Amino acid sequence: MTQPLFLIGPRGCGKTTVGMALADLLNRRFVDTDQWLQSQLNMTVAEIVEREEWAGFRARETAALEAVTAPSTVIATGGGIILTEFNRHFMQNNGIVVYLCAPVSVLVNRLQAAPEEDLRPTLTGKPLSEEVQEVLEERDALYREVAHIIIDATNEPSQVISEIRSALAQTINC
């Protein structure tokens, strides 16, 4: 199987952590769309949003998704990539989409423990726990709509990877 694997889900669900380890295990290339975009523009996501607003960032995110999609690649996407209909169809039609699902409490704990998350601009201007709750309520149905596979991401990365591998084996053998 050489189809790209798209990891989707909210901030803090483990897309980058799981994606890097999964790519290594499957001998695939790993790309994080946010990191790729930041390296291309030599700007942080916050700087891009400040300069171009969220609409400009979302347009660049779509271009990044198209640019990094290639066979034998694990792609960790930005949490809001599913907000654009084109992106949802593109991922569904060009690879296998894995939704790393986790409850608000887990996401908030992970985000509070990750100092680099302070570099991300707020989506709502609200306290973190309220923002995560609101954003997840808005996006969960979209994540589920686009996903070929839904994985409980509350477990340790090694367990999440094991569950992804099992689900991929079942998907391929259908």
From Swiss-Prot:
Subcellular location: Cytoplasm
Family statement drawn from the similarity comment of this UniProt entry: Belongs to the shikimate kinase family. AroL subfamily.
Keywords: Amino-acid biosynthesis, Aromatic amino acid biosynthesis, ATP-binding, Cytoplasm, Kinase, Magnesium, Metal-binding, Nucleotide-binding, Transferase
Residues reported in the UniProt entry to bind substrate: D34, R58, G79, R139
Protein name as it appears in the record: Shikimate kinase 2
Catalysed transformations (reactions): shikimate + ATP = 3-phosphoshikimate + ADP + H(+)
GO biological process: amino acid biosynthetic process; aromatic amino acid family biosynthetic process; chorismate biosynthetic process
Matching SUPFAM superfamilies: P-loop containing nucleoside triphosphate hydrolases (SSF52540)
Cofactor note: Binds 1 Mg(2+) ion per subunit.
Subunit structure comment from the entry: Monomer.
Any one GO molecular-function label of the UniProt entry: magnesium ion binding
Biological role: Catalyzes the specific phosphorylation of the 3-hydroxyl group of shikimic acid using ATP as a cosubstrate.
Predominant location category: cytoplasm
Domain notes from UniProt: The LID domain closes over the active site upon ATP binding.
Pfam families membership: SKI
Residues binding ATP: G12, C13, G14, K15, T16, T17, R120
GO cellular component, one term: cytosol
UniProt pathway annotation: Metabolic intermediate biosynthesis; chorismate biosynthesis; chorismate from D-erythrose 4-phosphate and phosphoenolpyruvate: step 5/7
Binding-site list for Mg(2+): T16, D32
Region (LID domain): 112-126
EC number(s) given by UniProt: 2.7.1.71
Gene that encodes it: aroL
